[in-house]
Regions:
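Internal alpha-helical scaffold of NAD(P)-dependent oxidoreductase catalytic cores
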Residues: 1-52, 57-98
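NAD(P)-dependent Rossmann-like dehydrogenase/reductase catalytic/cofactor-binding core
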Residues: 28-29, 79-168
Length: 168
C-alpha cells in the first residue's frame, strides 16, 4: 500500500506559457489528472516538503506513514525536517509558513496510516532510493544559501547506510 496518487502539475520555471495547456489537456484525456501552474517552483517545494519530511523517515524507521503521525518522537523528527526544508524554501522563493508545512505533512501521514513510500520500499528491497534527489536537493539548496540542515544530512547518511546494508 503505497502512499497515494495525486494530480500532475506542469509549469515552466520562468512563468507560464500557452504551450502547457495542450499538454495538460492530453494528460487529462488519458485519465491522468493534470493542471498547469504559473509558479511551478512553489509547487515543487510544496511536494518536496512531504517527501523530505515524511518519506525519508518511513525509510529510516521502516514504518508506514501513520507511525510518523502517531509516535511523538517520529513526529518531532518530521517537524524538524519540515522546518529545515521550509527555511531553505523561503530562502529560495519565500512565502512558506513552517507551522502550516508541518500541519500539511502531518495530515498526509494521518490520512494514509498504512501507506508506505517509495523510499521505504527501495530501502527494504535493497534498491537505491531517490533520497539524493529529494533530501539531497534540500541539502544542496541549503548549501547555496548557507542554511544548516543537520537533520537532512543525518537522514541521507542513514538511508545510504541502510541501502548498503540491505544490498549486502
Amino acid at each position: 500500500n503505497q502512499g497515494g496518487s495525486g494530480k500532475t502539475m506542469v509549469g515552466l520555471l520562468g512563468g507560464s506559457s500557452g504551450l502547457l495547456e495542450p499538454l495538460a489537456e492530453n494528460f487529462n484525456a488519458c485519465g491522468l489528472e493534470c493542471e498547469t501552474s504559473a509558479d511551478i517552483k512553489r509547487q515543487i517545494w510544496t511536494k518536496l516538503f512531504t517527501n523530505t519530511a515524511a518519506s525519508s523517515l518511513t525509510a529510516v524507521l521502516q514504518v508506514p506513514l501513520g507511525f510518523i503521525h502517531s509516535d511523538p518522537s517520529a513526529r518531532r523528527l518530521m517537524e524538524e525536517l519540515a522546518k529545515e526544508a521550509t527555511a531553505v524554501a523561503n530562502a529560495d522563493c519565500g512565502g512558506f509558513d513552517a507551522q502550516k508545512v508541518v500541519e500539511t505533512v502531518d495530515t498526509v501521514c494521518r490520512n494514509a496510516p498504512n501507506g508506505y513510500t517509495s523510499i521505504y520500499a527501495d530501502v527494504k528491497n535493497g534498491a537505491r532510493s531517490e533520497v539524493d534527489t529529494i533530501s539531497g536537493a534540500v541539502i544542496e539548496a541549503a548549501s547555496e544559501y548557507g542554511i544548516p540542515v543537520p537533520y537532512h544530512e543525518m537522514v541521507v547518511k542513514l538511508i545510504h547506510a541502510l541501502e548498503h546494508k540491505n544490498r549486502t
